[in-house]
Design a protein with these regions (language model features):
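N-terminal small-residue-enriched
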Residues: 1-235
């Protein structure tokens, strides 16, 4: 088992080669503020890096500014926004039957209907904050004490088609894949590997050097559609 991750990848390699050639002729994007649609991989990186780490209770407990930013019950977005962390889903990179304190893995809702409803805990942080252990105590190996870390974190599937999301955009960007990025509390910047301009509701030319930067809470509040094409990407 496991060879399925490396076998029968000819089409994936072909697409990567074609994209690399296309990028040679792509122009850098013009700086500005745009409506943005992001693909599944970049959405996963965004929610993991920009939001997920702020949901790790050891960081929240030890950081007064984070505690002030992340109170349970705070509204972060519209009702369509739902975010979870789930270590019980089979065959994913973060999957485990139990965390490293023996707490069973399960689905933990972090945002439901746009409202912060939970965070990720070890037994220690749960006791300190009067909440419940979530199965997120992870250790590199037996030499290290467990700390709070995500398992498989995602934005839940939405209802919008891709065509729904782009049809009313006069001028925007469709950003794909993740090349790198950084976060500083609620502020973030991520580079997409490649992107396309959206013009008059249609995908247009490829562009490069696309860096998405902003404030996490402002960005979550501005999400007005979530695609219905959710998929896990083991990358």
């Amino acid at each position: 088992q496991g060879y399925e991750y490396v076998l029968d990848k000819d089409e994936l390699v072909r697409k990567a080669a074609v994209r690399a050639v296309e990028l040679l002729g792509a122009r850098p994007v013009q700086a500005g503020q745009y409506p943005v649609v992001i693909d599944q991989l970049l959405a996963g990186v965004f929610i993991h890096e920009a939001f997920g780490h702020l949901s790790e209770a050891d960081f929240v407990y030890e950081n007064p500014k984070a505690r002030k930013m992340m109170p349970l019950g705070r509204r972060f977005g519209q009702d369509i926004l739902n975010v979870y962390d789930d270590g019980s889903i089979p065959n994913l990179r973060g999957t485990t039957l139990y965390d490293d304190e023996g707490t069973p893995a399960r689905r933990n809702w972090l945002i439901q209907n746009g409202v912060l409803v939970g965070r990720l805990h070890s037994r220690q942080t749960a006791a300190k904050m009067g909440e419940t252990a979530s199965g997120n105590a992870r250790a590199v190996n037996y030499r290290f004490a467990p700390i709070v870390r995500m398992t498989n974190t995602a934005i839940d599937n939405g209802t919008a088609t891709f065509e729904d999301m782009i049809k009313d955009i006069k001028l925007g960007i469709y950003a794909c894949d993740a090349y790198g990025g950084e976060t500083q509390l609620e502020n973030f910047s991520f580079s997409s590997s490649y992107a396309y301009m959206i013009r008059d509701g249609r995908i247009a030319e490829m562009v490069k050097d696309v860096i998405l930067a902003g404030n996490l809470f402002t960005t979550l509040g501005n999400i007005d559609m979530i695609g219905n094409d959710f998929k896990w990407l083991n990358t």
